[in-house]
């Protein structure tokens, strides 16, 4: 078994030098910067306006529901892209499986709509 020691040594040396250089640059950046506490820098950014209220307030659950809905439909799209690519090569079972998948997602969306998750 032939080992390629020289090639791996060059790669290993490159990784070590890159890591050391990144650490040195980060350390120099930390040590050489001025650290001034400014209320403008530590406040929450609200589209260019001064913050109206404390940023540590409660967050409405409706936003979480919208985020979960977005995640579900994003996941659905991630399943539909590969299916659309191999559509001509799949069998009848694959076609029925994706139609069943879309049907279950549609039923879930209708259920969320009827429960009022999308009403603000």
Curated annotation (Swiss-Prot):
Pfam families: Oxidored_q4
Protein EC: 7.1.1.2
Bilayer topology: Multi-pass membrane protein
Reactions listed under catalytic activity: a ubiquinone + NADH + 5 H(+)(in) = a ubiquinol + NAD(+) + 4 H(+)(out)
Record's GO cellular component terms: mitochondrial membrane; NADH dehydrogenase complex
Example of a GO MF term: NADH dehydrogenase (ubiquinone) activity
InterPro entries: NADH_UbQ/plastoQ_OxRdtase_su3 (IPR000440), NDAH_ubi_oxred_su3_sf (IPR038430)
Main location: mitochondrion
Compartments where located: Mitochondrion membrane
Record field: transmembrane: 8-28, 63-83, 90-110
Keywords assigned: Electron transport, Membrane, Mitochondrion, NAD, Respiratory chain, Translocase, Transmembrane, Transmembrane helix, Transport, Ubiquinone
Annotated family: Belongs to the complex I subunit 3 family.
Function noted in UniProt: Core subunit of the mitochondrial membrane respiratory chain NADH dehydrogenase (Complex I) that is believed to belong to the minimal assembly required for catalysis. Complex I functions in the transfer of electrons from NADH to the respiratory chain. The immediate electron acceptor for the enzyme is believed to be ubiquinone.
PANTHER family on file: NADH-UBIQUINONE OXIDOREDUCTASE CHAIN 3 (PTHR11058:SF9)
Protein name: NADH-ubiquinone oxidoreductase chain 3
Organism listed in the record: Cyanidium caldarium (Red alga)
Gene: ND3
């Amino acid at each position: 078994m032939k080992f390629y020691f020289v090639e791996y040594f060059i790669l290993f040396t490159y990784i070590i030098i890159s890591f050391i250089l990144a650490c040195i640059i980060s350390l120099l950046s930390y040590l050489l910067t001025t650290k001034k506490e400014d209320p403008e820098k530590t406040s929450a950014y609200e589209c260019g306006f001064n913050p109206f209220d404390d940023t540590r307030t409660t967050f409405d659950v409706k936003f979480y529901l919208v985020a979960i809905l977005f995640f579900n439909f994003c996941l659905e799209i991630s399943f539909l892209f590969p299916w659309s690519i191999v559509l001509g090569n799949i069998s009848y079972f694959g076609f029925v499986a994706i139609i069943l998948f879309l049907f279950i997602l549609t039923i879930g969306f209708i259920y969320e709509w009827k429960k009022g998750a999308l009403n603000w």
